[in-house]
């Protein structure tokens, strides 16, 4: 058995000596292709398949980043559903669909005439970010608790984003409203900035904003809390329908 990509020098040397001796017939050899793939090896297959699809599929060849936005949002919501349902098979499939969005966008970016980049650039940026934000894993810093890890993360992230002029920069405004409110509140609280929602305006929107800000301060994700409550509400409606 040849267990490595480099082969087995002992085996090949012995066969060479046997073949050159002229004193014995060579044994019959049967080639049985096999592989030992490292974790992540099939990601290379994903990249290769996506590349072929981009080149050969008329629909995929015409897609742009903007075209895929709605699909990316849908896939993330479907992933959330799979997680909350606890369905392992669905979770595996939906993770694959989210991965497709990443690979598809990277392949589209590769064709950009002005600022092209490829999947390796995406992965390289991610690796650099993860290593930099985990000095307790890849450096000499110490983190004995989850709070220590969060402190390292915030400090390193602040170093990376030192050019920002506001704590609100980088917060995606297109996310669901409750999640947006919670994220803004989290940024403000971390920076020691106190802005009360009722100081911003009146009406239903500001009352909802106040509740979201309060939930974030209490360590509750308002988006998840409302989604869970909405599920219960849905079940109650179904029960009332008889």
Swiss-Prot record:
Alphabetized SUPFAM superfamilies for the sequence: all-alpha NTP pyrophosphatases (SSF101386)
Signal peptide positions on this chain: none
Gene Ontology biological-process entries: dATP catabolic process; dGTP catabolic process; dTTP catabolic process; dUTP catabolic process; TTP catabolic process; UTP catabolic process
Family statement drawn from the similarity comment of this UniProt entry: To E.coli MazG and to plasmid pIP1100 erythromycin esterase.
CDD domains to which the protein is assigned, alphabetical: NTP-PPase_MazG_Nterm
Cited InterPro entries: MazG-like_dom (IPR004518), NTP-PPase_MazG-like_N (IPR048015), NTP_PyrPHydrolase_MazG (IPR011551)
Record protein name field: Uncharacterized 26.1 kDa protein in blaB 3'region
Pfam families, per database record: MazG
GO MF terms, alphabetically ordered: nucleoside triphosphate diphosphatase activity
């Amino acid at each position: 058995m040849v267990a490595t990509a480099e082969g087995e020098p002992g085996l090949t040397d012995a066969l060479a000596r046997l073949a050159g001796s002229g004193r014995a017939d060579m044994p019959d050899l049967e080639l049985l292709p096999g592989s030992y793939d490292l974790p992540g090896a099939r990601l290379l297959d994903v990249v290769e398949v996506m590349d072929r699809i981009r080149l050969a599929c008329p629909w995929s060849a015409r897609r742009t980043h903007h075209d895929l936005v709605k699909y990316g949002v849908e896939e993330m919501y479907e992933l959330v559903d799979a997680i909350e349902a606890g369905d392992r098979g669905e979770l595996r499939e939906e993770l694959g669909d989210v991965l497709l969005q990443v690979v598809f966008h990277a392949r589209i970016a590769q064709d950009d005439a002005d600022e092209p980049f490829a999947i390796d650039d995406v992965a390289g940026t991610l690796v650099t970010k993860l290593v930099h934000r985990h000095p307790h894993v890849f450096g000499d810093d110490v983190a004995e608790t989850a709070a220590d890890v969060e402190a390292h993360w915030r400090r390193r992230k602040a170093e990376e984003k030192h050019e920002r002029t506001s704590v609100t920069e980088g917060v995606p405004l297109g996310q669901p409203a409750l999640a947006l409110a919670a994220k803004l509140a989290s940024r403000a609280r971390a920076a020691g900035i106190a802005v009360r929602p009722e100081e911003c305006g009146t009406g239903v929107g500001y009352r909802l904003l106040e509740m979201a800000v309060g939930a974030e301060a209490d360590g509750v994700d308002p988006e998840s809390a409302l989604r869970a409550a909405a599920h219960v509400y849905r079940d109650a409606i179904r029960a009332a329908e008889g």
